[in-house]
UniProtKB/Swiss-Prot annotation:
Source taxonomy: Eukaryota, Metazoa, Chordata, Craniata, Vertebrata
InterPro entries linked to this entry: ANKRD31, Ankyrin_rpt, Ankyrin_rpt-contain_sf, RAMA
Repeat region (ANK), residues: 488-517, 521-550, 554-583, 1154-1183, 1187-1216, 1220-1249
Location of this chain's protein in the cell: Nucleus; Chromosome
GO biological process, one term: positive regulation of meiotic DNA double-strand break formation
Principal cellular location given in the protein's record: nucleus
Record's compositionally biased regions (Basic residues): 728-737
Subunit annotation: Interacts with REC114; the interaction is direct. Interacts with IHO1.
Region (Disordered): 1-27, 361-380, 707-740, 1242-1263, 1449-1482, 1512-1549, 1606-1634
Keyword vocabulary terms for this entry: ANK repeat, Chromosome, DNA recombination, Meiosis, Nucleus, Repeat
UniProt protein name: Ankyrin repeat domain-containing protein 31
Pfam families reported for this sequence: Ank_2, RAMA
Entry-linked SUPFAM superfamilies: Ankyrin repeat
Amino acid sequence: MEEGVQAPDWDSDETVIEGSVTESDLEEKELPWRRLLFDQDASLKSEFSLHPDTRGMCKGMPSPEIQLGFKLREDLQEQMNKNKMMPVLSEDTILQSQDETERNQALLQTRKNCSMFIGSFRQSGLSLNHQNIEGPEAESPEVLPHIEKELSEGRDSPEVSLLSGTAITVSDTVAVKETSLVEPEKILAAPNTFFEPRKEVTMTMTSEETKDEESSLETFVSALESLLTSPESTQEERLFELVSDFDRKELMNPLSDSLSSISIPLNSWSACHRDLLEDAKDDALPAELLEALNTLSEAKVETICHRKEGGSSLIARNECLEVEFNTSQTNEDCTQIAETLQDPNPSGLQTLAHQNITSCEPLSNKRNSNSVTNSSDQETACVLRRSSRLEKLKVSRDAKYSDHMYKMPEKILPKILGCEDLTNNNSSAQNFRMQDPALMIDGKEKNMHSARFKNGKQIRKNEQFSGKKEKMKVNKISLHSINRRNIFGENLVYKAALHDDADLVHHCIKKGGNVNQPSYAGWTALHEASVGGFYRTASELLKGGADVNIKGLYQITPLHDAVMNGHYKVAELLLLNGADPLFRNDDGKCALDEAKDLCMKRLLERYIPKHQKCLTSAQRSSIDPLDIEDVYQHKKPKFSSKSHIWHVYNENSNRQKLEHVKVNKGSKASLFINKEDVYEYYQKDPKNTKFGKSKHKQSTLDQIYSTGLRKGNLHNVKDPNTNVPKGIGRRKTQHKRTQVDDVDCNPRKILAVSPSRRINRLVTYQQHIPETHNDLPEELCEPSSLTLSSLRNGLDSSTEACSVSKEKHIQNLDLSDSQEVQCLELESVDQTEAVSFPGLLLHKEIKLPVVTTDKQPHTLQEQHHVLYKSHENSNLVPKDERFNKWENSFLSFVKENSDNDDDDDCSTSEKAITSKKVLCSTGGKKHYNFKENLTNKKEMGFQQFLLSEDHLSQENELKAVSLTTLPEQEAVNFSYSDNAVISEHVANYEQCIFGPSFDHSNGNPEQNSLACMRTLLTHEASKLTNHVELFKKPQDYIPRAPTFLMNQTDTHIVEKMAKNCDTERNYIDRDQKIIYSNEPLSIVAHSQVIETTKVEKRRQNHLESETIHNIDSHSTDNMSKELANISKLSQREKKEISHKPGMKAGRINKRNARGESQLHLAVRRGNLPLVKALIESGADVNLNDNAGWTPLHEASNEGSIDIIVELLKAGAKVNCENIDGILPLHDAVANNHLKAAEILLQNGANPNQKDQKQKSALDEADDEKMKELLRSYGAIETVNRDESDAIVNEKIPAVRSKRHKQCFCDDGKTIDSSSLSHQERSRESLSVHQTLSAILQDIEEKQEYLLEFEIRNPEDAEQYIEKMLKIKKIMDNVLAKQKAERDDLAKKYRVSIESFKHGALREQLANLAARQKSLLVVAKKQKKISLKIQNCRNVTSLPCLSLRKLPPRSEISSEKDSQELTSLENLEHPQSGSLSPVSGSMQETQLSLETWNYSQNTNICLNSEAVRRGEFSGNDMNSKQNGSDCTLDGFPKSRHSDGTEKNKLPSQPVAFIGQTEYSQKENDLTEATDKDHEFYVSSPVIGKLNISETASVLAENAAHPSNIICDQDLSNYDPKRGNRKTSSQQSPTGASESLAHQGIAVLGSDTVHQMKPYLKKSVSVVPCADDSQISSSSGSGQQDTIKKALNYSTAPKKKCIQIKDLILLGRINPGNNILEFKTQETTHKASILLNGKLKVESGQIYKNPVTWLKDLLGGNSYVTWNYAWSKVTYLGKELLRYVSEDAPILPEPNSVPQQYQPCLPEVACLDDPVQEPNKSMFEKTKFGQGTSRESMQSSPRYLQINEILLISDQEFLPCHIMDQHWKFCVECEELTP
């Protein structure tokens, strides 16, 4: 690609073939133009020039290759065919220009095998010092055919392979020897996996060869271009376009000015890189290569670095080029799909670039001394690609792979960097690798890289073209392109999944891509998605039909991968889709065995069948936990590091380029302070210093992410150490052998940014880089010698340090991506567990003191970290001591940093923390040194942390240390702009605390987590306990982790995880403390997160899921994992709420057929982690399913306390109702979840809110403790439990009918579930007929039981009544249903009579008739049941007492039953109404009144409902209506039925028909009023309604009771609130009327019968306005009056008679405008209300005609009763006449109440049914429930009680206390009169 000669300038005559050109020679000046237009030409797109500037070699001479290149372009397809036909690349083809096409194709094929590309060829003849190209090909001819086969199959275009990483040209290794004429050329050797190993091709380019070389390069490029035209080249085309943007000059900066060109193909770099990954043996560079590299001018190195930083550097351009290549190489590990180019991972790009650069390292191993040769494994490409994965699975999966890859790069890197300009190939190769993330992330970056274009416009055009074309290409991807497999057997779906391109995966699946196609190594796309924790991608694959249990290599399933890598969400997704958690791989381990995190284990256990759980647990218990930990550590670091790094660089690539660079710049003070430290430190070593600077710039330019890493490495001495260790940390076990040196030597962790695919490799790469660097070795080697021992302590401290530093850098870069950073830290911690890097750290720290104070903080951090590590490695106690001191100093430093950096660099403090972690890994010696340094620094900056320091002083040293650490983190968190990072740190911190709390205190959450895992040992546990204690106070003191639930979760986890009781307690305490302290930090983090999220927006969805997974997998410590998740989730919640709350809302809130969201399902399963994840992802916590249930309902029903807390924190409404009005509190109480109920009550749940059944939570409670809890929160219990039950039963139907009335009216075939009992609900799915028949049958059974039930005492009677009322309620509902269905059928019949002769309507009609008969039978039985209870009451010696004790509802129920029977019978036989005994009916009526009084609102609703129904009903409907009203109201039905029976239906129908319209209005009013009454109407209103209703009922019996009732109810009801007033005015009348009823009842059975219905009707009417007054009058007034009434006067004077009396007698019926008063001027009309009052057109209500006339005639006018009654006419007849016609005249209304009261005792008979009801009503009135203003007037002593009732109870006493008083009054016999 590049030629060794440096291009003199960027002239347009560069030999790069960038545009399609005809065979004719083109002017050199046309090339740039072609290049610009390259993007526009589709054919051109596929072309790209691998060599940046062959012209430079020719020095201005156009290369003949250009023509050839153009020719190739002109006929790309033909050339492609030729390429396919070329089995072997021969020297002749290369030498012959006419065969250039084939030659290029062959080269491309060879490149496919070997990513290495020999940049310089002579056109006429390349002189190969060792072998001709033909030789190597001959040696491995089979490789070429294989490549051709691949190409022919469309698997991979040769250009892809060319870019891939092995150069076919070099069979085993390509060694480019420096010619004598030129400086040692840079030799790029890429192992040729396809060719036999150990075959070397050495190409020596002389100055003479430059022209030929150019032409050959051109030819090669053209061949590549032609190959790019392959269908797969769509992705690659992007790369080539990018390449076209690059100047060859950049690509090939000659190593020297000599003409000889070094052939260092990008492919060779990538190949070397891959080979290195594959072959760990290639760690050492050959001596020759090292010499050659060393010869490279250092100035160039610096310059190159500088360029990178600048952004216009070769690296940047090379990166672009490299990206292009990688795109073509999409099949390769390091390469990405064209879609991947879009992947925003600048860090990945840098990583690739670095890797590519490092790929030169392969040259060092197994190369002939004469040439730099890469010893490439003979494994197939797929093996190469997958070998990393296999290694990862075995050792650390990707860790080893990355180790090799990184090792060599690290070694080579310094020199490569030095030679970067010289060897443009290196940079191009580097760029090539980097291309994936960087370019993909930003097409714009391509343009940036193509700085070679002097014209920025041209660059922009190229970008636009490439972007547009890329989109078009994606859309145009064909199915065969998707399913075409590359050399590794990977199709496009696989590659897209590998790079977490969910959109591309979706597109491919949509196009028909095979989601289950395995690669040659046996892995599928789902495996890759699971390994990387790519939730979206995995979800898309599963949606596309991916086999969730598909087996990969070694029988590993995706679930294994997800669990081993700690990807919780992905694992849960797999489990939800049927993954088998017990499936075992070849090692005999199932996913559950691989899980080391408690959350993950719990997740898996939930999906294990119960019968298998015991076996599984037993098996797992048999495994040595230590072994498991070790295995897990190996695996986890691999995965975690990989996933974390991947995640980080993904986010970083986007943000780092966008924001990270800025952040780094902004945080230069902190990050760069470290850098300065490093710089100063490195100044001793000029190379290092230069490199550090240049590297930093370079990293900044290349990848903000890598820059951050590099920065950290370069900036902080510890960072270089740390950074190296960071890389090492990931593969610490792998790097143990020599990585300490590498780490120490490597300031270039920047390079550590591994290929986009495997960040682990990046780490390894970084580690190796130090080895490679000769610059750093001087400095780093010294510490490395120290660190070797420490590294080999079992955990490479250097590795750890590297990981940490790397994480640090990532964090700095990823300020916005704190989560990613956290993951990285966790990884690093895992890998950095062993602090074996003390030497480096010591060295750094020692020099840190020299560094500025800012640097010192970093040093302190590092020191602290090192100390901590050494503690872990060596002794916990010494560590504690050192740690305490160091920590204190560090705290002060951290505080300083945080204070100083908060403004600019939040990341700085965080970095410092990271450094600290790394430092902890240093040896104990260094710890002491650090201590000293820290002490000094401590003095300097600890003052800021005096408080924390005080805390520390209060605590023991360990405590102090941990505390200081907490402040550090705290400071870091605050200073750190990225909220996510902070939360992660905190989470890790806490996690570590849970494990070894001291770890967290050290500030290295990840390391601490791992350490904690290991320290679970007994002695370590004790240490941990101490740390935990320390942390407790620090946490209390410091608001760190921003998660409230963390403490609960942590406590939970701790309980399970902690092997130590002490540790467990400590954790718990600490968690609790943390909860309070967390919030401030979370808030700060939140604000910071908002800033960072701007950068993250594109990747937020992916990052969220990935971050969560990464967090889970990264923390070795289960506790730490969960804590991290929790903190992340909470912070994410805030984050999402702040900026992108609804990003995933669409998917997350997606519902199933039942309307349930994922959150509903997760809550029902009790999956707390998933619930948190969903909430954090923006799930709607108040989303109702189809039945109205919310997640809080589900959690309350299950009693899941933790989930309830989570939901409430997320904003769940505590008083949300379902369609039946059921609250979460009802569910918790009904299921006896005491704790859940308490939490709900604490959060504002209303204990008095009732459902549609009118049951409150207290009514649902069966447990005394639950009742007490509810009462303590103000729950009010009904005065009488039995009454309340009865009332509830009566109310429920009314409310339900009210709510679902439309269902009944509109559709007779549907039964409203709310109106049915629970038994009915269970049958809702059945047909209407079957349901109703089943209900009736069930009722019959219950009735039989009641008939056999023996009533022995009042308790039995109460139970009996309760059951009777339930039956009655059901019957009412059935009756309403019957009625609605009948009406529906009648309408249909009127529309089409013929339709009933056949078909469904006829069957429906027959069913209706059958059910009607059954209902009649049931009604008769119900009447018997009601008579039974009545007889029992009559028999009792103390009927009053029995009535009292048996709540009036019992009477009511009996009354209802009898009435219901009556109504039912009336349906069948309207005229023959079965009348219950007069006494019985009266009792029922009175009882019903009492019940209404007690129930108040309930009765009102029911009665109003009944009234409505009555209005709806017609003739027969009236009886049914009455029945339905009774059904709904319970009492109303009986009253209607009784009245109907007496009046007989015929009379009723007329009345109803006459007032149909009115009744309908009344119904509407009733509905509205019912609701109002439920909330507003008090008992007085009920009483009023009862009386008025009674009056109306009497009138109704006489004439048209239903009609009257409706009218009165309407009139009373219309005013709603005004009704109360009106009724209160007429309440005395109502009382007298009730007395009159009673008197009538005594006088005669007919009257009694009438009275009974009246009373019943009054009960039903109670809902209307008069309800309260009537009930009160009928209650208190009636009882007193009844006692006096009969004796006082049986035949009162005429003037004493009132309209209400006439209504009771049936002579007058209520109605609208039926009373008239004529004057000369006009006629005044008034309406008669049910309560006997008059209502005029203006709406004003008068008690009687006298008051009406007084108002009309004037206030001063005197109007006598005779005058008024003689002048006011009713239906044209004076009222006085109706009075004269009356034989028995009722007492005068005004005097009746008082007169009757004294007389009642004389007349009253206990056996008298009338008297009994009166007593019961009186009792109710006495208690104030039935009292009203009327009763107040009649009995002033109750006035105050009434007032109290009218006012809310809360104004006087708590509801539950008042309820107790009322209950006492009811039960107390002494209070009865």
